[in-house]
Amino acid sequence: MAKTGAEDHREALSQSSLSLLTEAMEVLQQSSPEGTLDGNTVNPIYKYILNDLPREFMSSQAKAVIKTTDDYLQSQFGPNRLVHSAAVSEGSGLQDCSTHQTASDHSHDEISDLDSYKSNSKNNSCSISASKRNRPVSAPVGQLRVAEFSSLKFQSARNWQKLSQRHKLQPRVIKVTAYKNGSRTVFARVTVPTITLLLEECTEKLNLNMAARRVFLADGKEALEPEDIPHEADVYVSTGEPFLNPFKKIKDHLLLIKKVTWTMNGLMLPTDIKRRKTKPVLSIRMKKLTERTSVRILFFKNGMGQDGHEITVGKETMKKVLDTCTIRMNLNLPARYFYDLYGRKIEDISKVPLLEKCLQNSITPLRGLLWVSKGEGFSPSGAKMYIQGVLLALYQRLKSAKKYYKQLNLVMNEQKEKITEKVILSMTAKEHHKEQEEVSRLIDELQTAIKSNIGHLCKLGPQLQAEQEQFSSYVYQHIKSLPANTLVPGGLQLKVFENGKNTGEISVGISKKDLGSDSPIQTDHMMERLLLKIHQRLQGSSINPPGLNYSSMRLFDENGQEIKNPLSLKNEQKIWVSYGRAYRSPLNLALGLTFDRVSAFARGDIMVAYKTFLDPNAVLLPGCGNWEVCEGFPINFNCTSQQIPDQFEKVDLENHFLQNKVDPNIVLHASVSIGKWSFSGSEASSRSQIAPSILWPVASVWLITKTGMILSRAITQGCLAIGHPIRVKAAEGTSLEGYKLILQKRHSGDDSQKWVFGTDGCIYSKAYPQFVLTYLEELNAQVDVTQTEYHIHHGAWTTAHQEHGRNLAEEVLQESASNLGLKQLPEPSDTHLMPEGSLEETGELTVALVRKLEEKHPKASAQRWAIKHEGTSKPGQWKHSRVENPLWNKLTYMWPVLPSGQLNEEFDWPIQGLLVPSSPPMKKPICKTTEPYAPVRLRVLQNGEKNKNRSVTILGPDISPGRKTQCTEILNLPSAARRLYNEKGKEIFALKDLQRDELVYVSCGELWINPDLSIAQQKKQIFLRNLESDIAKIQIFCSTHKIEALVLEVQSDIVSGSKLAVHKPVAIFGEEKQVTEPEEKQMQEDPLTTENASSEILDSHVRAHLRMKACHTLPRYAWQETSHDFDEDDSLPKKTEKGLFENVEPQKKHSCSPKHSKLHKHCHQQFEYRDGQIISHAAPQLVLGVQGPNLRSGMEVVLVEKKSDGSHQRWIHQEDSRTFHLVSNPDLVLAVSMTKTRNEVCGYPVIVQKYKPYNNGAANQKWHYMKNIKALVAFHSTALDKEITSANYAGVCTSSVIKEENIDQPGYCYLSPDGKRKTMLCLACGQSMRTEKGLKQLLPGVPFLCISGTKTQKPFLQGPFKVISVAEVDLSCDKAEKTLSYYQARLLSLRMKTCTQAASHSGMAATHQKAVKIIAYKNGDGYRNGKLIVAGTFPMLLTECTEQLGLARAASKVYTKDGTPIFTLRDLVLWALDESFLQRDSEKQKQDAAPVGKEQIIVEKNPRMKVKNRLFAKSVTSDSLDGIDKSLLTLILRNPIAIWVSCGEPFLPPNALQKAEKLEKQNWLKKDRILADLDTMRHKMRQLKGRRVAACQPATMVPTKSPVQPVVVEGGWTEQTQQEIKLMELIRHTEAHLSEIQEMESKINFPIATKRIAVKPSNLYKQPNTKRVWIYLNGGRPEDGTYAWGKTISELLQDCSSRLKMTHPARALYTPSGEPIQSWDDIERDMVICVSMGHGFKTPKELKQLMEIRANYARIRRQQGPQATDIVVSPSTKLLSLAHLHN
């Protein structure tokens, strides 16, 4: 019963709920008659339902209605609650722009957590959906329902009471939900105290594009005060616009949905509402601007009439259209020209006509026709093909149209039974008539088009006939054939490296077309093309060039010489590319160890240790565990008593040695030296390889410990230590004390093994703090041999001397038996017979411990060091270094101490790395900015231009970004402008030296071309250059065609990664000595042979030149015999002469003895071929292989570690072809890379190369494995094969090697134009003309003779030579050397003639001038680094000076020591005569003590004139030297004449630099003394003050008669004593004197040769004179202005005129307010200035009014005539009457 009652009760409640819901819907309809829902409407619904009905008793329909309404409102109106008074806990809130609401504040007890909140809701019978009820606790809580808040409100009334009390206690806070104006989706919760902060927060949180300015409530009312905003209200924030109702769009949308119905046919819109027309977003003007005016054009390939391409072309340049056609039509070359139907070139794409209307196939009109050419001429066959196809199509359409027209006529004739087209029968009469007119019009159009195309075909008749007669040559009529004597250089294969690196090789192929130009003889243009080609190839590579700027690109060879002529490049040459920077060697200097084998022999109790040969098999055991460091020579060494060897080098027995633990008889001695090391690998080349030595891979790596020890990474038991004292002689003659560096066994308490790293980059010795580690080679210092150990080296003595040396050593040992304390061998009695340089180890020391130099010493960098990380362990160590100079981080250098001098604890100690000398300064260099120049107007001309009227005016320097391209673009130069010259040919470096409107010549980098020079002389120079290039090819062939037997060997150490090469075998080394003498005799006979060979083709005049040159060149230093017989009156300093003539001695290169070299190389040349691998016999774990996954031809073969599965290290030996094929790629074989410049030391490198299956021309791929001696012999082939291979690599035609014989060789072929004859070319000829003809490579097995060498060759087949004819060159085995000598003599003859003609302009022939000995110095260097030059002509003197002095540009000026400019050798000889007589007269004047009178003063003022008059009074004039006694001239000219050479800069006296340095040093010493005295006086002052204060003596009271101050205090400890007062005055006087000295120092301007701008003192607080301002025209807007610079008002006015492009010069300046500027002081930096041409100040508004007045005036005169403006103004009658009354 109870259950039934409960059910009845529930049913009653359900009925009541339905009734309540019905009432709610009625309320809804009444409140919203339009059926829309908004926030105000839904509010009473929720209140009505939730207040009167518990949700537990709601029916399912009611719950569904509430949930649907809730979800709808949630999605439409945002996440905020609908009722503003809903209960929300204090901690609840919304994150910015979030759709989730967080739980309530956990710090309060109202709602503890989310679980309690859910349980309360469940107990209160508030229904929650299953998806939300079953959500995990960690998931974010969704938007809370309004029903849940309401239930919470009913449930916890007590909590609400507490909450309201809390609100009463809190201050007034604006807590709202802010929405973007007009939106309900972009919102944020904001809590702020004021309206201003509310606007700021809303600007940031709502991401408004402008600052928030206004706040609106939900009803649209604007809130101005915080009290206007209710708590927890919804507000709308705008940026200034009025309120936008966000519900308006929703309301309209709901209204539209109400009136729209769904039907079976789709959506039905209301019929009573008129649909408005859709308005476009863009305006008509914007549509015109944005729409793309493009046309469709029909393109065909040249010579084709089918497969056309319709390409849409817009308003683009012709170049872009050509590029589009190249891509769309898939052309193999870029498109160059467009031709129309008649073969005319199209220059404007917009003028292409439309096709006939009947040929249009779309609504968009089609234009055409155009034929695309790749550079060839127009081919009419393509137009013919197209017209024939069009005519065929037109005839078919005309036939069908006429047939259809007949069908239409049958209707008119009422013959419907004959009509076959059913469409016609269904037409009405009107449609029939219209169709008949259209078909008739179509027939007329077709007939007209047919007639037009037939006419086109008739006009093409002559062109078609010419093409049929001339075949394919018709389209190449515009190409002119080159003369027979010109030839573009052949192809090159270059190996490009990045500057400063020797890895990352990039192979670049350069063909003849890449270097070709309209004038092939222009090397400058070819160089530009070469740079561009290399730059394009490097794009995207590891070198990564910056952008497209290749104007600063520079190329260098292996020697660091810049490459400026592409003709000097050779195939397979290595080059280094740089972008604007100087050459950096890929090998870097580092401190390392060199190990030498040591042996000993004993006789009696005396033992002598000496260096001997190394046994590589025993020594190559790197690692600390195999060696032990011994202090002194090992005792357990088995000494020998054999005879002393012919040459030996003694080693001190007290040194530390390395002894092998396995074999005690293997003892090594380590030497410390500087070597060249590659950071990228273990490759090294020691600079001081005294004896054959072995460098371990880690011999240059050191470990720096915290205690200051520097340990060797190779031998960790040994450390860097101080050796015996030495004395070092610097280049300037000064002697420095020092100590030798050695490797010792480490001891923790030894200070001589500890080092201190300073904050200046120096490494100090702890035992001798005043000495630092020094790189001697940079210091240009040599070790004084008298203070070092003694070494004997008899290798260069004769046999008698060797025997004497052996006996002498035996005597030494016998005499030493009685003296056990003797430690060093005595010096032999005949040491003067020993060759210079025999004291080799200490004489060539590269590093030592030397006394610290001054900080400003020019060679101070020799004592700076850096640590370069090496190895794979501890990477990134350099990042912990703390050095101010950013260059250290760029070079990844590190230093172990901080700038404060403390150890850097951030390092992972010990530090491992290389010790690099000559490091950059540790402090950041101070960059001085140069003063900006004022703009100068110049007239520019292209280099060599003769017509000065073609000059163009420019303004320079321009500040715009395009300033560098001004001259390039205006003069239309082929490449970027780089150098400037004046009218006299002097190069310009600074524009400040130029005058206004001065004429300047612009070049692209080449030297100045004299406009007066004849073209014939230029052609002669070009001919000589081409002839030299041809002779160079022949010379390369002659040096390589007789390739001797070469074997495979390892270049450096036998370690993994070592490179391989082919070199002379050690087995035939004994024969070299026998071969040497005949070669020397042959070399001595060569000049005679050359002279005899040239006598047939040279005239007597040139033969005399040749003999004279041979006399000077054969005895290279013939003048040295008399070089020491100088007179006392010599003009050069004695020290300079001594150093100079000592350096002239030829430097003898140290070479190892034959026996030692044989043992050293024997293991490097032994290999075994076993199990498909080529194994090193010395190290069986290493085999030949190729590194890298991507195999390609040209990769180097190196030693790699042996692996069983390595396919890149297995080879297949094919004995029939004598080749070794790589297993991973059988097309690649082991080959020798035949570079054109063979390295005699390293030989030819070994690479993998694509297999060439030819009988001849592939000798570098043929090998012979000699199993008995374990050697691989290269070039194992016939002599003919070697000669053809050498010819191919030298670029010589093979027909000059073999005469009238067909052989199998690599080559090319091409077909004749008629396709009947096949022409065959060799490899060199084919590469030289590959781009001109369609060459195809010949298959193997086709014997042929190159067509270039036959007598029936065509004129254009010049071959690989530029000048020489291939048919006239005979390079067969026995005539190659004679041919080379013949052409060399011919080249020499032509050069002599050219030099003679060039020197004839001075009035006397060059042959009449005797060669003069000259000492050349660089201008500004004083007497440093002089070079001896013997020259016969002045141009030869300038050339030699440029090369030997290493000048950056060509030498152009020569000065003597007194500044006299020299222009010819005759002037130099005359000056030398004058100088010699001047010195003799001065000596006589000193001897004759005459009274000083007026005459003597006059003579002293001009002594040279007096001597000249005395010398040449009778016998000689200034234009001739014939009258001078030859013996006197020879006596004077026996000593070299000192000259100073410059590149155009003015003369600097030789002693100016020394004087400046001396004066600076004196000032420094003087200032140091003053500072020391000042410090002493200040210290004394402090002492006096301290004593006075410490004494605390009381003051005395002295009575006075003054009533104001009856007692005066005197004395006491607070008053200064008289001594202190005097000392203070002295201190002030000294400080004033010091400031005067410093001020004088700042004003001194030292002359420096390399700088043109004097060093000026820079003051931090002094503003520069030049000011930058913002200028604009008078009457204009300031925004339209620009910047201007100036030092004065006049200069600023001039700059304003040029920058604003004013029609008249600027005359007045105003401020923006209209105030005139009169003084320069009124102008400030970045000031806005109005510029006027003389008129008064005008604002933009006034200027506009003035323009309107002028426009009205002109309009009236145009419309009503000139008389309309003839206005006479007269006073009014009223004014006249008033004036009359007044009178």
UniProtKB/Swiss-Prot annotation:
This is Doublecortin domain-containing protein 1. It comes from the Eukaryota. It comes from Homo sapiens. GO terms for cellular component: cytoplasm; Flemming body; microtubule; midbody; mitotic spindle. Microtubule-binding protein which plays an important role in mediating dynein-dependent transport of RAB8A-positive vesicles to the midbody during cytokinesis. Gene3D superfamilies: 2.80.10.50, Doublecortin domain (3.10.20.230). The lineage of its organism: Eukaryota, Metazoa, Chordata, Craniata, Vertebrata. Residues 168-252, 925-1015 form the Doublecortin domain. One of its GO terms (molecular function) is carbohydrate binding. Residues 117-131 have a biased composition (Low complexity).
